[in-house]
Each structure stands twice: as structure tokens, then as C-alpha cells.
From Swiss-Prot:
<protein>
    <recommendedName>
        <fullName>Weak neurotoxin WNTX33</fullName>
    </recommendedName>
</protein>
<dbReference type="InterPro" id="IPR018354">
    <property type="entry name" value="Snake_toxin_con_site"/>
</dbReference>
<dbReference type="GO" id="GO:0090729">
    <property type="term" value="F:toxin activity"/>
</dbReference>
<feature type="disulfide bond">
    <location>
        <begin position="24"/>
        <end position="45"/>
    </location>
</feature>
<dbReference type="GO" id="GO:0005576">
    <property type="term" value="C:extracellular region"/>
</dbReference>
<feature type="disulfide bond">
    <location>
        <begin position="76"/>
        <end position="81"/>
    </location>
</feature>
<dbReference type="Pfam" id="PF21947">
    <property type="entry name" value="Toxin_cobra-type"/>
</dbReference>
<dbReference type="InterPro" id="IPR045860">
    <property type="entry name" value="Snake_toxin-like_sf"/>
</dbReference>
<comment type="similarity">
    <text>Belongs to the three-finger toxin family. Short-chain subfamily.</text>
</comment>
<keyword id="KW-0964">Secreted</keyword>
<dbReference type="InterPro" id="IPR054131">
    <property type="entry name" value="Toxin_cobra-type"/>
</dbReference>
<keyword id="KW-0732">Signal</keyword>
<keyword id="KW-1015">Disulfide bond</keyword>
<dbReference type="InterPro" id="IPR003571">
    <property type="entry name" value="Snake_3FTx"/>
</dbReference>
<feature type="disulfide bond">
    <location>
        <begin position="64"/>
        <end position="75"/>
    </location>
</feature>
<keyword id="KW-0800">Toxin</keyword>
<feature type="disulfide bond">
    <location>
        <begin position="38"/>
        <end position="62"/>
    </location>
</feature>
Amino acid sequence: MKTLLLTLVVVTIVCLDLGYSLICFNQETYRPETTTTCPDGEDTCYSTFWNDHRGVKIERGCGCPRVNPGISIICCKTDKCNN
């Protein structure tokens, strides 16, 4: 009985996805759509927006970085939420 219980515990641990990795878009302005799998423990995606002499620039990725004045940022917490 103990062997069966131990076997069930081991199988459960092996079969469970013990870690979840967030997927975020990571392309820049006017680039083809690409995604990246965020590092373990990273649970946020971001999009930043700013203007330069060529127009609106957009950057996307994992995390929620601090930005300088004049740069807008949106952070979110679900897969591919930063498009």
C-alpha cells in the first residue's frame, strides 16, 4: 500500500507542470510579430510607446521596466497580452 501511494505521489509530481512560463510579444516597431518565453519568475509583459523624428516607436518584452519621462508603458500579466 505504501509503495502504491509513493508511486502515485511521484507520478503526480512528474506529470504536473510545476512551473508556468509567461509568453510575451517582443517585436519592435514595424518588425514581424515574434514572441519570447519569459524567464522563470517573470509574470509581466510590457509595451512601451514614444515619439521620435520618425514617428511612434513601440517596444515589447518581458517584465515591467521603469521608463523615462515621455515614454508611455502598459504592463499586463497574461500570455501575449502586450500586442
